[in-house]
A protein has these predicted regions:
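His/Asp/Glu-enriched, well-ordered alpha-helical/loop segment
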Residues: 233-239, 283-373
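C-terminal cap of metal-dependent C-N hydrolases
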Residues: 10, 359-404
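Active-site gating loops and adjacent loop-to-helix segments of metal-dependent hydrolytic enzymes
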Residues: 69-100, 134-149, 213-239, 261-264, ...
């Protein structure tokens, strides 16, 4: 039995359970409710009391890249950043480098409350070994480039081999999706193969889209339409699970198309600000019914993987974009980091909320720190959710549990 001053299950209506508790049996949540009820259900269970803290679902980072280039590619717009630093890095990256990077990034993520990461990276057998040992949940998405000039990326054959070796392993904690770095890095035939692989292995597809304004003109030049419409033409919106990173530059018709196709969006506010890419229309996406998750992007364009910091930035950026202080409020952004993030990756039936039968992915965040004070748990000024979003940081996480 896990208990704390407050439990936030992140179920509909956003209940706030005072002196609540979560009963964990094996790798799953057995029950959620009052401490008294949990003791009655399991009188012999071990009790762990986190005191003045908040228990909530583990955070879901819907777009990240392992790596270790922090502080080496600074103050550059996105296309120069890619051309001058990221592509050259990929040309010299070794399998050993890549595995070490995943160990570091997964450890950082767990320490700051992220239990599930969507990680687009290279040589990902090493990433799988890191996740298997560290215990995090990961959706691994190889950087695939199958077009002239991008032969230093992984291939679809590499991606398929990774699926065959690791998809569903570590008691289901490791999943492997089909990855395309970008539609510009793939031929039409490669796009068709990618979609076929999703169907063959019943897995998802992840790629970048509409990150920078320059992409719009490039898509018009290559395809005669917007990037989202080009993805549609190439068949890349057809798999059952599709997650698009960024989606900064969208019009109303494209937002409607994403909603119609049930496409998940990974919003990366720190990266979009740092690379001067723009600000995604989060309020419009949510209003249209699109599942929006939060992503840190990589450590080199953030420069950390702290999801508690990221949700604050996401909320503030939306308020500035909309010039509306009520935009993307605390409950909505917390939902993006938990249950809506789970929906964006097609795993809302397994993770993202504290409900019986779901995986026991749970974190505890201290509320006895100066930046979480005052900690008001009821009444008209109840501020638990506001303080989590606008006050807490990854260093306040005092417990991270994955699969029990």
């Amino acid at each position: 039995i896990l208990t704390a001053a407050i439990v936030l299950p992140m179920t509909p209506d956003n209940p706030v359970l005072q002196d609540g508790a979560v009963l964990v049996e094996g790798d799953r949540i057995a029950a959620v409710g009052s401490l008294g009820d949990m003791k009655s259900l399991a009188p012999e269970a071990e009790l762990i009391d986190y005191g003045q803290a908040v228990l909530l679902p583990g955070l879901i980072n819907t777009h990240s890249h392992s790596g270790f280039l922090r502080g080496t590619a600074e103050d550059l717009p996105v296309w120069d950043w890619l051309r001058l630093f990221i592509d050259p890095m990929h040309r010299v990256l070794t399998a050993e480098d890549a595995e070490i990077a995943s160990w570091l990034c997964y450890a950082e993520s767990l320490l700051s409350g992220t239990t599930t990461s969507v990680d687009m990276w290279r040589y990902m057998a090493g990433s799988a070994r890191a996740a298997e040992a560290l215990g995090n949940r990961v959706v691994m998405v190889p950087y695939v480039g199958e077009a002239e000039g991008y032969d230093y990326f992984d291939t679809l054959d590499d991606n398929e081999a990774l699926i065959q070796q690791w998809h569903g392993k570590a008691d289901g904690r490791i999943n492997v999706w089909v990855g395309l770095e970008h539609m510009y890095y793939a031929t039409p035939e490669a796009c068709r193969r990618a979609v076929a692989m999703c169907e063959r292995y019943n897995t998802g597809l992840h790629t970048h889209s509409n990150e920078a304004e320059a992409e719009i003109g490039e898509a018009m030049k290559r395809f005669g339409c917007s990037p989202i419409r080009a993805l549609e033409q190439l068949g890349l919106l057809e798999p059952e699970r599709v997650l698009l990173a960024h989606c900064v530059w969208l019009d109303e018709d494209e937002i409607a198309l994403l909603a119609e196709k049930n496409i998940g969006v990974a919003h990366n506010p720190s990266s979009n600000m740092k690379l001067a890419s723009g600000s995604a229309p989060i309020e419009q996406l949510i209003a249209a019914g699109v599942a929006v998750g939060i992503g840190t992007d990589g450590e080199k364009e953030n420069n950390n993987l702290d999801m508690l910091e990221e949700i604050k930035i996401a909320s503030l950026l939306a308020k500035l974009r909309c010039m509306d202080a009520a935009a993307y409020g605390a409950w909505n952004v917390l939902r993006s980091a938990t249950i809506e993030g789970a929906r964006a990756i097609g795993m809302a039936d397994q993770i993202g909320s504290l409900e019986p039968g779901k995986q026991a992915d749970i974190i505890a965040v201290r509320a006895d720190t100066p930046r979480m004070t005052p900690f008001l748990t009821d009444g008209p000024f109840m501020n638990v959710h506001h303080n989590l979003v606008h006050g807490a940081l990854g260093g306040d996480v005092c417990m991270t549990m994955v699969a029990g």
